[in-house]
């Protein structure tokens, strides 16, 4: 049929509005997802969180000498929570992380200390880029590690991958499957609701005839909007637990809602910034931890029916310097703390190997050394929980699979074939 000028204008305006409401990275949707697939949520703490200030070796003389003015006590008022030992060194959890202590005691939460990006950069942007592309020392990698993981597993589902930010993170760079959704109720054609059906019909008609490279992505975006709308009631989402107020909780609720809509969500990412504590670290870190731990605790309880297939990892680009600075803060460091939460996590433990805090044991004599590459943590989750053995593709620079025992699952025969060069162009449309 011939398009009228009115159809063209309505369709184009709605297309622009639709793209603003749900940005995409070259979507590729299929049939609804396998309900047995695991769900993986990545929480990135932007700014370099102070891992050694969250899980601390309070009895260590070197630690006290470096941080006595900015740490918490092991007993008395404001005391931390005892966690147990790593490498025969006892550790305490920050007192503002009480919600994490509950998850730790229920054996759903594990910590991995002295972990992180082995590249020595102290640049926020370089470190985040290296980590999220999954190729330390190589910023020219044109895809993110989660993009390559999803390519290896041939994702199905209406919305297999989502991010709650305004743009996709580098871990989803080049993804043909990912959308950004910060508010599920607003994931729709924007404009007057009276004309919503007409706008969508016009846009479908335009893209069915143009033959442009945008046809596939636009049509798939419309399909995802229609599928979410069909499953999503008009009323705001009502969780089964109470979340604290704030943007972090809003992002977590959006993910929880998408999981419950059964649209085949397999991977979700979100960012939580504000961890660059160069000054006044005690109040800032305490407030950040309180919000992070209570929000994740609420999110986990909200998804109680999904615990058996839910894994959450929390990480940051680097840790902080061991010694406090003159502004009652800490500067950019190296070794850090990662956290893994889920129904198949071997929680209630601290994993890794503690390197010590004597000068000779520190990285460059000033920072906590790294004894566990962050890719070791992610690789175990990818293999045992996400059932992907293509580590050569996901993390092309590693050559060994050395699980720590973080999560339960089957160790597959690892395929070290990278397939990296052939995949980089992302020519699939």
Residue map of PLM features:
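Short, solvent-exposed mixed-charge patches
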Residues: 428-429
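Glycine-rich and small/hydrophobic secondary-structure elements
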Residues: 334
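Acidic/histidine-rich, metal-coordinating catalytic segments
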Residues: 311-319
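Conserved functional hotspot residues at active sites or interaction interfaces
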Residues: 425
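Histidine/acidic-residue-rich catalytic or RNA/ligand-binding cores of hydrolases
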Residues: 325-328
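Feature for exported/extracytoplasmic and membrane-associated proteins, marking the mature portion
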Residues: 1-305, 323, 337-341, 346-417
